Amino acid sequence: MNRGNPQALRHPQVPLGIANIIGRSTFPSVEGYLALSLCVAFIASASVFTHFHSQPEIKRLLEEELRNNTRLTTAFGINIDTIAGSTVFQMAHYILTDTTLIWVAINSYFAILAMCTKLIIKLTFKELSRQEEVAARQAFLSYILLTIVYLSVVTGPQKGHRVMPWMIWGGVCGFLSHLQFVTCQRLKYTSPSCDRGSQRVSFISLFLFFVSIAMTFMVSRFQQHLEWQPAVLLYFDCLLAVFRSTYILFRCISSSRVFSFNPDSVRHFNYWLELATNFACELLQFLSYAQLFVFAPGLNLTSIFFLYHMKLTYNCMREQLGRHRTHKKIFEHIESAYPSVKAANSDDRCIVCWELLGTSRRLPCSHQFHDWCLMWWLAQDSSCPTCRYVIPSPQEEASRTDSGNGNTMFRFNGRTFGFFTLPSFTVEVGSSFGNIFGRAAEPTQEQLQSMLETVLEMFPQMSPETILADLRQSGSAQSTIENILEGRMGLNASLIPGVLDEDLSDDTDNELEYEEHVEVVQEPDRTRQRTWTKLSSSSGEAELSYYEIQRANMIETYRRKYLASDKAADLRAMGITE
């Protein structure tokens, strides 16, 4: 059974479809589902106990049915004579043979798994961010949709009692898939040096790994009771769970303090580990979809569904290989173009990952960054992350070469007709006529996904719909980031305290409490007024969070450094010194 697209571990999909509509609604919520399931289970349990106490003869009938049931003895080797007289087994048999109570039992099983998942996430990660909650909810709803289609194929020609084991198996796989997805998201966006809660993450990685191994042993134990087609599908599920759990376990090991002395080797290992795991999971999913497509009962909508997902999985594998080739070219360009130097101060940090610099690469603008940080940055933007100094990137050179190769040159030599001589000229015809009409080619869906992830990493408080709308207009992540920073799209100015403010008036109410120490400078060539605010030392820093205080202090420090530099000579001449 396939657990959605594992590419979502790296690149979240642009929200589309029914799963997104349900995922953004307030219903069904996990709390509401658990409360409703608890009420239904309580009513069903009370009904069963009342039925057993009001009709004592039902115990004798159930005991005879259990003694005549040979499937338990054949499949599990259980001695029926010893358990036939137990009231607990009689109740379980009664529930499993009732067409209504069995669905209540399955729903209670799903509710218990959902409650365990929520409890484990709460104990391990405390609170999830808004972006993580939305991504996890959409991935879970996509998994439910895929499971429904999957069950319609594997259980279509089978009897009702054979559907329940598949649903139990699907619940376990969904439980593991959701925990793996949330853990991978947290490992992706958390710095290795931030070891807060690392023990809890290590425990959950070991738990997921051992559960995946136990699932594999269980399938191998009961393989002889299954046909080869269902057994292969179950092994696909086990391999997917083992690969993802192994990836999480190795990421936790590589992020530990044991390997902190060599961060470049850790990044190199994590890159290849992620590439190999994603490609292996995509290949397993492709084979699983292919088997479901081939052995589906006739050509129907489910066949088209699996064929479509086969195409998506194949495209994901191609994109991963293409992205790997691009990163390889960029890394070779970094090694050949930018020298490797040591940081001037031992406490200097890379502004991309906020880790200690150590040995890093120096750009022409004299700013230093880690090899891997610079590679990931240049894959998105060909400029310095600090000063926006434009630097050459092999990605842009390749795109210019490709666009140049797609054009056709027509050369006309001048000829003489009587007394009239035609001039010689050259005409270049491009492969795309979009620029002729004043409109560039629109970005593809994959490019939009990559740019959306880039912007959301920097501004997680922004709405994905707002960012997508601006990306479709601007066509680049850099333009959208500039629009957000300059206040041209939906960013609340109260989120950036202590910075230069050219658009707000003096009487603007701030969400945070600041002392408005305002100086007004009349510029000779413009009638605009420049104001700024400074964090008040008497306003009570206890009301602000640690992050807000540190951010305001950092802005104040760099503002003073700028005023003391040569670039701020004009400001010092006006009397602005702090």
From Swiss-Prot:
Q: Tell me the GO BP annotations in alphabetical order.
A: endoplasmic reticulum unfolded protein response; multicellular organism growth; protein K48-linked ubiquitination; ubiquitin-dependent protein catabolic process
Q: Which GO terms describe its molecular function?
A: ubiquitin binding; ubiquitin protein ligase activity; zinc ion binding
**ZnF endpoints (RING-type):** 350-388
- GO CC annotations, alphabetized: cytosol; endoplasmic reticulum; membrane; ubiquitin ligase complex
Q: Which cysteines are joined by disulfide bonds?
A: none
Q: Name the InterPro entries on file.
A: CUE, Znf_RING, Znf_RING/FYVE/PHD
Q: Which residues are glycosylated?
A: N68, N492
Compartments (UniProt record): Membrane
Positions of transmembrane segments:
32-52, 76-96, 101-121, 134-154, 163-183, 202-222, 230-250, 286-306
The way it spans or sits in the membrane comes to: Multi-pass membrane protein
Q: CUE domain: from which residue to which, for each copy?
A: 447-489
**Keywords assigned:** Glycoprotein, Membrane, Metal-binding, Transmembrane, Transmembrane helix, Zinc, Zinc-finger
Pfam families tied to this protein: CUE (PF02845), zf-RING_2 (PF13639)
Cited function: Proposed to have a role in neuroprotection.
PANTHER family in UniProt: E3 UBIQUITIN-PROTEIN LIGASE AMFR (PTHR15067:SF5), E3 UBIQUITIN-PROTEIN LIGASE RNF8 (PTHR15067)
How is this protein named in the record? Answer: E3 ubiquitin-protein ligase hrd-like protein 1
Originating organism: Caenorhabditis briggsae
